Amino acid sequence: MKTVKTKDFEKEFTKLPFSIKKLFETQEKIFQKNWLDSRLHTKRIKELPGVYSIRITRRYRALFYFDKNGDAIFFAIGHRKEIYRQ
């Protein structure tokens, strides 16, 4: 599966601590093999139809959706208390 990151995602990603960036890269590799792997704690966001989250740490999440080609589009990353407000 192909993953794409939006400009907004990349902008927020650059602001994250190095340790969170490395953990996301690890999670992304798992995601590409199986987006429903239990280590990702993938959840559907009820308030945002078609949007899902994966857990990076207990506090950090990344949001994504699937485009018409089946590619995963990551559009937000950040602290769990702030990310859903975007």
Language model regions located:
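Active-site metal-binding motif and surrounding structural segment of the metallo-beta-lactamase
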Residues: F24
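A short, surface-exposed loop/turn module that caps and links secondary-structure elements
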Residues: I30-I54
